[in-house]
Amino acid sequence: MDDSKVVGGKVKKPGKRGRKPAKIDLKAKLERSRQSARECRARKKLRYQYLEELVSSRERAICALREELEMYKQWCMAMDQGKIPSEIKALLTGEEQNKSQQNSSRHTKAGKTDANSNSW
């Protein structure tokens, strides 16, 4: 007796179950693979460019911080010798001027708000 079954007018032979893979166009599959590889290489190139830019910007930041640290070391050595560096004097006088400007502007604003509050 034959093990094949008739279902819907078609003869099914026993064997693997499930969908049978359709005939794959090998040229199309190869082209898709090549395209995917091209896209992968392009993404990799962009990623490496981004990382290189990130590294160079961090290196520039490190150099700037080293210069700033060296400047602060020089200031500390000068202050240990009893000298006040001119940069620190400029910073201090600049802060004093800013404080005096802020205080004068606060008094001016306070005067305006008091005048406005008493006008009703």
From Swiss-Prot:
Any single GO BP term: positive regulation of fat cell differentiation
Residue numbers spanned by region Leucine-zipper: 62-69
Disordered: annotated segments: 1-24, 93-120
Record localization: Nucleus
Biased segments, Basic residues type: 10-21
Keyword tags: Activator, Cell cycle, Differentiation, DNA-binding, Nucleus, Phosphoprotein, Transcription, Transcription regulation, Tumor suppressor
Single GO cellular component term: chromatin
SUPFAM superfamilies: Leucine zipper domain (SSF57959)
Post-translational modification: Phosphorylated by AMPK.
GO molecular function, one term: DNA-binding transcription factor activity
Residue numbers spanned by region Basic motif: 29-60
Domain bZIP: 23-86
Family according to the record: Belongs to the bZIP family. ATF subfamily.
Quaternary structure, from the entry: Interacts with CREB1; regulates CREB1 phosphorylation, stability and transcriptional activity.
Function summary: Probable regulator of CREB1 transcriptional activity which is involved in adipose cells differentiation. May also play a regulatory role in the cell cycle. Identification in a chromosomal region frequently deleted in various cancers suggests that it might act as a tumor suppressor.
Name of the featured protein: cAMP-responsive element-binding protein-like 2
Organism: Homo sapiens (Human)
Lineage: Eukaryota, Metazoa, Chordata, Craniata, Vertebrata
